Amino acid sequence: KQAHLPLLVYLRNPATGGVFASWGSLGHITVARPGALIGFLGPRVYEQRYGEPFPAGVQTAENLARHGVIDGVVAVENLRPTLDRALTVVADRPGEPPAADPPEPIVEAPAWDSVVASRRPDRPGVGWLLRAGATDRVLLSGTQGEAASTVLALARFGGQPAVVVGQQRVTGGLDQFPGRSAAANRVGPAALQEARRGMALAAGLTLPLVLVIDTAGPALSADAEQGGLAGEIARCLSDLVTLDTPTVSVLLGQGSGGPALAMVPADRVLAAQHGWLAPLPPEGASAIVFRDTAHAAE
């Protein structure tokens, strides 16, 4: 890793104790064998120490993948193509970029019309962007678990490998990943930690970082406050502006609040039509100025 080479980890059965608490948890990508026992403290040790069995179903590959602790579950017979796909993204040389398409004219629209358009449930999001615009995609742990509102992936765009960190919007169609339910489009501490993992991954593999902004705003709850939401926003900003690898931010839709601002200060910032950025949603600004939300369109 110090030499910026990819470290891929495959956890077999069992993978516990010091192995899981050292190199087994330090890979750039970590997958496990189906049904593998994975955890820090083995269940027999726990039962002997505490006089009761460890809760069933916790220390399994499938459960840890659902919670985003590992990146996925891969059968032995599927390991070779999985590794090949991952290494194609992170280790192959960049290809020649394709010729750029001629720019299309952008029709001016009132700001509120753009806000309304960005909230349409059928508007393409980061999932659509990965499927339509990228090749050799490898989805990592951000597609599941507590950080499910942030998508983390390795992909190639026009032959150029990159790490993708994208805020996952709620839709039932274009933007939903196969095999997963749509996540709430509010960004909490775990989602920002996943974004920071993407930044570290880009730095460790010396790959460009693409950040896709599309969020209705931060999770506003006791859990978010106690989980250090403000601190995670600050650390995202700090990590991003000090990153040594090329960075591009894409305002794909809504760009509301601290979680959006935390992903903006890249080397290049692009905006899709109807993409917008604000420290809080228009309804919030209306509440501050007029003490109601009826003036949001103004």
Task: Spell out what each predicted region is.
Residues 1-92, 213-298:
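Conserved catalytic cores of soluble enzyme domains
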